[in-house]
């Protein structure tokens, strides 16, 4: 029983703390990778309003592909 408590005390967190992508403060486990619910909702709002976008080429023939070497 005593050994179980010692083993449980040595459990390491799954994720390393990172700075919040919005404000730079240390991240919070509950809101990972953000520091707070506010920063999490700011980021979600940006995604929902289209502030973040993944660039795509209108025509694949005009897309800038790296030269392939055979």
Swiss-Prot record:
Residues involved in Zn(2+) binding: 20, 23, 35, 39
Record note on cofactor: Binds 1 zinc ion.
PANTHER family from the UniProt entry: DNA GYRASE INHIBITOR YACG
Gene Ontology molecular function: DNA topoisomerase type II (double strand cut, ATP-hydrolyzing) inhibitor activity; zinc ion binding
Subunit structure: Interacts with GyrB.
Tagged with keyword Zinc: yes
NCBIfam families: PRK01343.1
Family annotation (SUPFAM superfamilies): Glucocorticoid receptor-like (DNA-binding domain)
Classification via Gene3D superfamilies: Erythroid Transcription Factor GATA-1, subunit A
Protein name per Swiss-Prot or TrEMBL: DNA gyrase inhibitor YacG
Cofactor: Zn(2+)
Family under the similarity heading: Belongs to the DNA gyrase inhibitor YacG family.
Keyword list, A-Z: Metal-binding, Zinc
GO BP, one annotated term: regulation of DNA-templated transcription
Function: Inhibits all the catalytic activities of DNA gyrase by preventing its interaction with DNA. Acts by binding directly to the C-terminal domain of GyrB, which probably disrupts DNA binding by the gyrase.
Organism: Rhizobium etli (strain ATCC 51251 / DSM 11541 / JCM 21823 / NBRC 15573 / CFN 42)
């Amino acid at each position: 029983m005593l050994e179980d408590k010692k083993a449980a005390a040595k459990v390491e967190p799954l994720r390393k703390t990172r700075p919040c992508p919005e404000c730079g403060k240390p991240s919070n486990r509950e809101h990972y990778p953000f520091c707070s619910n506010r920063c999490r909702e700011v980021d979600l709002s940006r995604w929902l309003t289209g502030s973040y976008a993944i660039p795509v080429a209108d025509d694949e023939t005009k897309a800038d592909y790296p030269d392939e070497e055979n």
